[in-house]
Each structure stands twice: as structure tokens, then as C-alpha cells.
């Protein structure tokens, strides 16, 4: 299992396919997505990569966190996240993952925090039909109605759909197609909508319910901290030492 990436949602636009049809896409940007640390079975009980993205002000970073970034020889990051991987898919600490970590045409799963809507009624939150417009209904047209039984069960069950806080939840959208890549600017264009606000942080992974394309780089595509050119993955050249576990 390859590592995912952390990206920033820039917004939505559209592109045109070969048939002249417009395709709505969401633009995701990789802004210095680097490997900050490893998680190993011997020390942590599982294998994972800790990635960081964005540039944080040093004054806003704790002393302990500054020490961890110094060990990894990377700048302080705004956002950190872990991705479970196989031991053979570990990337070197300090490596910067590039946009061609994914390939055009593959499917990805995108995770983000949905837009908060505040306190919402049952019609907006759960798509309830509401009560009748006339004939005995007064001031309760948008209410949810009864919430339970009579003496039995004598209570309202947990998880009953009612009015409450809507949005601001962790949401994963499955099987979004990668439409275009801009490697120089670190942009990934995926078809359709992505959860979250413009400027929010998004996690992008290989689709769990779709097969990984054969031309997808293994264990990933990245550039080293002191190198301007991306390092070829093992899938591109078996003799290359740039991509290693």
C-alpha cells in the first residue's frame, strides 16, 4: 500500500476533454509535502509515514516540535498527517512528494472536513418532508414530528435523526478520477467535488476499491531535499537508487 499525500484545496474549475465536453474538476495543490518521520513496528507497533505540508512560523511551533523538524531537516509544517504503508513503501525522511505520485486516469479517495452549516433543522439536515402546510398545523411546518413510541419503549432512541449541528465532519469521497497533473506547479485536478472549504487541507490516497494502475510509481514519486529534479520510482527504473524503502 502506497502513501497518500496532503494537499490544499484551491477551488473548482472546469477543463475540456478530447470530445469537447467540459468536466468539472477540483484543483488540489501540493505545497512542499515532505516526509517528516517514520513509524515502525519495532518502535510504534505499526508502519506509517508522517507527512507535513505548508510553512509554519517558527514562533508558533513548540520547542518539542521544532526538535522533531530539526531531526528530519525540514522546515516547520502547518499540517501533519500519518499514512499507513507497507514497510517496502517507506520513503526517505525529508523527501518531497510530487504531483506525479499519481497518474492521469487513476481513481483516488479524498478525505477532508465538510463545510460547517451551524445548527440546522431536520428538513435541511436529514431531508425530512416536514408537516402539512395547512389543516391543523400551526407554527410547526418544518418540525420533525414524533420522536418515539408510547409507554413502550418510553424513550427516544440514540441516533434518532433530529435537528442539530450540521457539517464540520470528517468526510471521505471515494473514486474520484485524476483528470490532469501539473508537475511544475504541484497541481492535481480531480473530477467532481471534494469535501471542505477552499484553502482547507485534504488527504488524497489511492482508491481502496479500485485497482492501482500498472504505471503508478512504486513506492512513489518524490524529489530529495537538495535535488531540483524528481527522483524516479522503482517502477520507472529498477536500477535507480532514488526511490528506496
Swiss-Prot record:
Cellular component per GO, a single term: cytosolic large ribosomal subunit
GO biological process, alphabetically ordered: translation
Gene Ontology molecular function terms on file: rRNA binding; structural constituent of ribosome
Domain of life according to the entry: Bacteria
Biased composition (Low complexity): 225-245
Assembly, per entry: Part of the 50S ribosomal subunit. Forms a cluster with proteins L14 and L19.
PANTHER family from the UniProt entry: 50S RIBOSOMAL PROTEIN L3, LARGE RIBOSOMAL SUBUNIT PROTEIN UL3C
Task performed by this protein: One of the primary rRNA binding proteins, it binds directly near the 3'-end of the 23S rRNA, where it nucleates assembly of the 50S subunit.
Descriptive protein name: Large ribosomal subunit protein uL3
Lineage: Bacteria, Pseudomonadati, Pseudomonadota, Alphaproteobacteria, Hyphomicrobiales
